[in-house]
Amino acid sequence: MKYLYLLRHGKSLWKDYDGNDHERDISKKGIEKTKNVAEKFLLKNEIIELCLYSSSRRTKKTLRIFNKIIQINNKREKKKLYHCSGTYIFNLIKKQNAKKSILIIGHEPSFSEFLDIIINSNVKINLSLLGEKIYTSSLIKIAIDVSTWANINRKNNTLIYHICPDKYVGEMKKKSNQS
């Protein structure tokens, strides 16, 4: 069994935005919400063995905030996670065989596109009840029933939980069984 966590960056700061999206920082609200999600995650006593994160300023800051609470030892910046497709995330994960649990800190719509690839439509409907997208600072956990990441597909994936910054959505445990 492998475990994948998706963490969307904290709410970005639009004040003084100069058109350089890559360099936008996190707002104070984004900092607090990211801390809130990290504290909820800490209570679960789960271990993240590898963190892959986008090169954007807000993603790096989200990692720093999360890491102060969670202590992730193995972190790798992936420049292509910024403005990537869901297919890129899927292929990136397939190359990570040494680890049991991976956290990806990234962006929308990349995460929604990735979920469309990895989770069948019945599970996606349950996620969409939370909104049309993954909100900033939200954390999703997916259990993937494979022995190596190279074997991931749409089968036997279970959406375990979705932690939103303002509330804990809870255990979902909806299994993906679509071919």
Where are these regions (language model features)?
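Residue-level preference for the first positions of well-ordered beta-strands
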Residues: 4, 99-103, 139
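Glycine-rich, phosphate-binding/catalytic loops in enzymes
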Residues: 22-24, 69-70, 94, 119-123
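Domain-level recognition of soluble alpha/beta enzyme cores
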Residues: 119, 123-160
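Conserved histidine-centered catalytic loops in small-molecule metabolism enzymes
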Residues: 48-69, 74-75, 143-179
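A glycine-rich beta-strand to alpha-helix segment
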Residues: 101-119
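Glycine-rich phosphate-binding loop signature in dinucleotide/nucleotide-binding domains
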Residues: 44-47, 95-100
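Short alpha-helix plus adjacent loop in nuclease-associated cores
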Residues: 83-93
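Active-site-proximal alpha-helix that buttresses catalytic centers in soluble enzyme cores
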Residues: 2-84, 134
